[in-house]
């Protein structure tokens, strides 16, 4: 099971100042996800992920970022989508372009396309 941590702060200076703490958090999650680790800092948020790779070992790195239509979407995720191929096909037909075969990327594109309503489409 992957490890996920993070912080949201009203003061963006606290996010930047806490970077050493995020590195320690990430290190403490290493046993949860030995395959890849990542930290994403932006404005008022910090996202930390330690990945236990199951699908797409090379390209499913997290936190995963998607820039689409002038919007930026960032996701840390632990789980498994059982209908990844179907959702991938639907999203590709709508013009989404993928760089991996990970369910994380499919989930990220699904949210970009349908917003919170994407949850109704997940299996």
Protein language model regions, located:
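N-terminus-centric sequence/structural signature that marks the extreme N-terminus
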Residues: 1-123
């Amino acid at each position: 099971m992957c490890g996920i941590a993070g912080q949201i702060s009203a003061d963006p200076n606290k996010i930047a100042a806490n970077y050493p703490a995020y590195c320690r958090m990430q290190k403490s999650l290493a046993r949860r996800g030995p395959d890849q680790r990542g930290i994403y800092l932006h404005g008022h948020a910090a996202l930390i992920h330690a990945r236990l790779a199951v699908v797409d070992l090379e390209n499913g790195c997290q936190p995963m970022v998607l820039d689409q239509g002038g919007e930026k979407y960032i996701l840390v995720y632990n789980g498994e989508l059982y209908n990844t191929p179907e959702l991938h096909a639907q999203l590709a037909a709508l013009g989404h372009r993928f760089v991996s075969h990970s369910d994380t990327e499919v989930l990220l594109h699904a949210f970009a396309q349908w917003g919170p309503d994407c949850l109704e489409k997940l299996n």
